[in-house]
UniProtKB/Swiss-Prot annotation:
Organism: Salmonella newport (strain SL254)
Transmembrane segments: none
Gene Ontology terms: biological process: queuosine biosynthetic process
GO MF terms, alphabetically ordered: ATP binding; ligase activity, forming carbon-nitrogen bonds; zinc ion binding
Keywords assigned: ATP-binding, Ligase, Metal-binding, Nucleotide-binding, Queuosine biosynthesis, Zinc
Protein name: 7-cyano-7-deazaguanine synthase
Binding of ATP, residues: F8, S9, G10, G11, Q12, D13, S14, T15, T16, C17, L18
Catalytic activity: 7-carboxy-7-deazaguanine + NH4(+) + ATP = 7-cyano-7-deazaguanine + ADP + phosphate + H2O + H(+)
Length: 231
């Protein structure tokens, strides 16, 4: 039996990954992390979506220690989430240092327990928002280290790594989940489901990607299939 673990926030990217995993694996588990995030409404959204999309199990892990260690606008109410700035330089204040290091490591430990062959994460280098822990070289390096540390061959899969947001919408549509992803996921840094607040960087990327896909469906779908190898 093929098993996978999805790092699952209930947002656009991880929900698209879950929709795909349900077609590619016999059994899919979801792991969601409670780190005291500003947008912690995503935890309830993730619970609902994991059930709706047929996950075999859904674990919510308490990692609130990360909130104490990592200073970010997503972990401190006193630090405002900035509006989207198209030409902003540097790492944004929404970056949570160590988040993906912790999430992927814990997901791999869970995968070891349930005998899963893969950990799936929705990180993306094309639209990575300046986050260093969304880069392909980071994921591959951590995967190598985790496998050495556990003497186990668990793959870190990144199905969205080389596609952009419009193509991610196309992928959701390919698996028949465009409306669900649009209406029921939570991507917004301010914790608003669906189309979100419309001002933060996460909402901007999501909206621009959706608009581009809806305006150029055939071309974007073709590009997505070419990059992912889907038919």
């Amino acid at each position: 039996m093929k098993r996978a673990v999805v790092v699952f926030s209930g947002g656009q990217d991880s929900t698209t990954c879950l929709a795909q995993a349900r077609h590619q694996y016999d059994e899919v588990h979801c792991v969601t992390f409670d780190y005291g995030q500003r947008h912690r409404a995503e935890i309830d959204v993730a619970r609902d979506l994991a059930l709706k999309l047929g996950a075999r199990a859904h674990k919510v892990l308490d990692v609130t220690l990360l909130n104490e260690l990592a200073v970010s606008s997503l972990t401190r109410d006193s630090i405002p989430v900035p509006d989207y700035e198209p030409n902003a330089d540097g790492i944004p204040n929404t970056f949570v240092p160590g988040r993906n290091i912790l999430f992927l490591t814990l997901a791999a430990i869970y995968a070891y327990q349930v005998k899963a062959e893969a950990v799936i994460t929705g990180v993306c280098e094309t639209d990575f928002s300046g986050y260093p822990d969304c880069r392909d070289e980071f994921v591959k390096a951590l995967n190598h280290a985790v496998n050495l540390g556990m003497a186990k061959d668990i793959r870190f899969e990144t199905p969205l790594m080389w596609i952009d947001k419009a193509e991610t919408w196309a992928l959701a549509d390919y698996w028949g989940q465009l409306d669900l992803v649009r209406e029921e996921t939570l991507t917004c840094y301010n914790g608003i489901k669906g189309d979100g607040c419309g001002h933060c960087a996460a909402c901007n990327l999501r909206a621009n990607g959706l608009n581009h896909y809806l305006s150029n469906k055939a071309a974007v779908m073709a590009a997505m299939k070419q990059k992912t190898g889907l038919r």
